[in-house]
């Protein structure tokens, strides 16, 4: 039986909270899933359905209850690659020939290192290399390379998968942005581990035009930038516009949204 370890970011650190199991995987059935919280974790946080739990539907408990409906745990759809990110991973892992259920398992195991939110699959974390920890890119790299940035980053030795945690049809990247005082310019980097609370570099979700990236697609993305500012002026609670930016690349614009799920102390 295949199993994956689930982690949660709680009070400033990643901790193991449970095991996702595939009880029928020996029969090549990856659609049936179960979640069992770790015993010590369940003892400390029993019955909590807040950020300690994987979802409201699965509060922390000692035993898994499928409510008489065995199958796919819906919260997994929220953390595994989807949309443009899924297409990248399916191609990158060369799993086009697998069934969608088998693809889901492989994507959970290898591509769920940095989803939006406070959950991740521990098995997805790449081996740590010094070159990847000290690899920086320019803003021009991100805004001009657009969809090719991941391949470019991978070729240079970065753990590019750490930038793929956002779902949706529009291509998106999860990046960090800081300032290099030596060169006097901004530095962009990929943070697949998200484990250094002393680093205050900004967290961004960088969004590119969806579809065929036509003039209309590009203008829709540009309009989104201004809509956020108008909503903020009207007093509507939305993504913070502090640090939000609209960058014009050689071919397409990119919208840099501050991460709403990350708080830097």
Regions found by a protein language model. Give the residues of each.
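Phosphate/dinucleotide-binding and metal-coordinating scaffold of catalytic cores
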Residues: 1-265
């Amino acid at each position: 039986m295949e199993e994956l370890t689930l982690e949660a970011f709680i009070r400033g650190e990643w901790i193991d909270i449970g095991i996702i199991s595939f009880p029928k995987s020996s029969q090549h059935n990856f659609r049936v899933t179960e979640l069992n919280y770790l015993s010590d974790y369940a003892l400390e946080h029993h019955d909590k359905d807040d950020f300690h739990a994987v979802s409201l539907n699965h509060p922390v408990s000692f035993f898994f209850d499928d409510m008489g409906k065995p199958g796919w745990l819906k919260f997994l759809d929220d953390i595994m690659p989807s949309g443009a990110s899924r297409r990248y991973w399916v191609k990158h892992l060369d799993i086009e020939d697998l069934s969608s259920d088998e693809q889901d398992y492989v994507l959970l195991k290898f591509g769920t290192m940095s989803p939006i939110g406070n959950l991740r699959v521990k098995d997805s974390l790449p081996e740590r290399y010094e070159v990847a920890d000290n690899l920086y890119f320019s803003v021009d790299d991100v805004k001009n390379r657009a969809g090719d940035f991941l391949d470019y980053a991978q070729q240079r030795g970065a753990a590019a998968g750490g930038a793929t945690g956002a779902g949706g049809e529009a291509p998106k990247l999860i990046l960090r942005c800081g300032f290099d005082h030596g060169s006097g310019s901004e530095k962009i980097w990929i943070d697949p581990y998200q484990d250094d609370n002393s680093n205050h570099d900004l967290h961004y979700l960088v969004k590119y035009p969806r579809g065929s990236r036509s003039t209309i697609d590009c203008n829709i993305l540009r309009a989104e930038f201004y809509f956020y500012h108008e909503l903020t002026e009207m007093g509507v609670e939305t993504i913070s516009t502090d640090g939000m930016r609209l960058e014009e690349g050689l071919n397409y614009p990119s919208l840099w949204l501050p991460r709403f799920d990350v708080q830097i102390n």
